[in-house]
UniProtKB/Swiss-Prot annotation:
GO annotation (BP), single: isopentenyl diphosphate biosynthetic process, methylerythritol 4-phosphate pathway
Upper taxonomic lineage: Bacteria, Pseudomonadati, Chlamydiota, Chlamydiia, Chlamydiales
Gene3D superfamilies: 3.30.230.10, GHMP kinase, C-terminal domain
Binding site for ATP: P90, I91, G92, S93, G94, L95, A96, G97, G98, S99, S100
Organism encoding this protein: Chlamydia muridarum (strain MoPn / Nigg)
Protein name: 4-diphosphocytidyl-2-C-methyl-D-erythritol kinase
Length: 283
């Protein structure tokens, strides 16, 4: 059985202040996109795991096996399984590759063994793997509240195009939050104008990302785009309405810039419950 494991963008992220437990209260917009990994699952004589395209992923202690262990504990099903993962989402890119793989694994196991677990049950298991893992059981577009674990599904799909720009080095979320200053937190509650409040903290740690954002803004100058950081990075993205591509002048210019800059083009996708995300590896 084969399943698409989509990347996730934080279209915006507002820091609303530090809580009594030491964590920051946030409001963020999650969006699943058509760029992602491919997971394959089969029953086997013994547990096995094969990773393609990325040797940095741990074989024995990754989010897929964590989900497998949780599923087995919850259902009592311990049949050996074989996982094969084709990785496209870079490790530490801020695109929630590990969280997406974990959620996809839970869904896949539920399908494979026909256990009939509800989305709510799967979401509850997903919470034990990662803060944003439950998001993937939404429609594919949602608000993240609290520390990001409270997911409010949004039904509308933003018709935008995203161009992703990866970095060779990731940013740990804990490191980004450790250097947050009170002045970084949003004063406005107007989500229409929200940006990523983690940008300045991350840029204090990574001057190269700040310079790369400036380079992208200069490169895309003359086209109505937004350039931002997703989550705590280290992926930068360019966002623009897909309608621009119907303008021949813009369309030609956009394709030239993408070819020159090495960006990866992707689009928003939705999940049609009770199915999983459509297998779209290209936008």
């Amino acid at each position: 059985m084969h399943f698409f494991s989509p990347a996730k963008l934080n279209i915006f992220l507002q820091l609303l202040g530090k809580r009594e437990d030491g964590f920051h209260e946030i409001v963020t917009r999650y969006q699943a996109v058509s760029f992602g990994d491919q997971l394959s699952l089969s029953v086997s004589s013994r547990d096995s795991f094969q990773i393609i395209n990325d040797c940095q992923l741990e074989i024995s202690n990754n989010s897929i096996w964590k989900s497998t262990a949780l599923f087995r504990q919850y259902t009592g099903i311990t049949d050996p399984v074989s996982w094969r993962v084709v990785k496209h989402i870079p490790i530490g890119s801020g695109l929630a590759g590990g969280s997406s793989n974990a959620a996809t694994a839970l869904f896949a196991l539920n399908q494979m063994f026909q256990t009939g677990l509800s989305d709510e049950e799967l979401r509850s298991l997903a919470e034990k793997v990662g803060m944003d893992t439950p998001f993937f059981f939404s429609s594919g577009s949602a608000l993240g509240l609290g520390r990001g674990e409270k997911v409010v599904t949004l039904n509308e799909l933003v018709v935008d195009r995203y161009i992703l720009y990866f970095s060779n080095k990731g940013v740990l979320t804990s490191e980004a939050f450790a250097v947050v200053k009170p002045s970084d937190c949003s004063l406005s509650k107007d989500l229409e104008y929200a940006r990523n409040d983690l940008e300045n903290p991350v840029f204090r740690l990574r001057l190269d990302l700040k310079e790369k954002k400036r380079w992208l803004e200069d490169l895309w100058k003359g086209i109505p785009v937004y350039v931002g950081l997703t989550g705590s990075g280290a992926t930068l993205f360019v966002r623009y309405p897909k309608a621009l591509e119907k303008n021949s002048a813009y369309a030609t210019q956009i394709q030239k810039i993408i070819a020159l800059s090495g960006g990866v083009s992707t689009s928003p996708i939705q999940r049609d419950t009770p199915n999983w995300y459509p297998t779209i590896l290209e936008a």
